[in-house]
Amino acid sequence: VVALSGGAATTTFTKVITIVDPVVLPVTFESTSINYAWNDFSGGNVTVVANPHSNAANNSTRVAKMVKNAGDPWGGSWIGLGGPIDFSANKVFRMKVFSPRVGAKVLLKVENAGNGSIAFEKEVLTTVANAWEDLAFDYRTINASNAYHNIVVIFDNGTPGDGSANFTFYMDDIRLTDAMPNSKIDLPVTFDVAGVNYTVTDFGNNQ
């Protein structure tokens, strides 16, 4: 910037301006030009970290780490997007989660940036411990005419956290898809269909 005075003298001022890209779906935490700024509340704490459990299920370089500390039972965090979410075609949220235990509740909520009462949420349970799984949140009944700008995540809503490993979760690849995963088992049983839980129940001392 060069400021001209009434005479011949000039003053030069240099300032570095950093321009960051807005957060948009899918939220992958991989971009170095996006500030993934989470807003923590009531004991929740989210940071973007190197993926500590990289494997075939999730080989991302970076993921979000949620620690639920002591606080309110609804402690969590939210992130604002650069614009309203487009639900015109896809209405099923997917999010990869690494949970320390089976049966942990995962609530994913969307809110209007100016009016928090305009919101929609779904809650699902984790089905594996100490492994990545791709959870699905059925948003097919959402009022798509409303504008939703914020994504809220709460783990174990209704239970206060304690900041321990038992309340430490990881999440990644928040995105919209067009269908719920196929969770029922159809014949023939090949054990090869993604999204199907091939749980086998033993009986008669058989293992």
Annotated model-derived regions:
Residues 20-207:
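Beta-rich carbohydrate-recognition modules and glycan-binding surfaces
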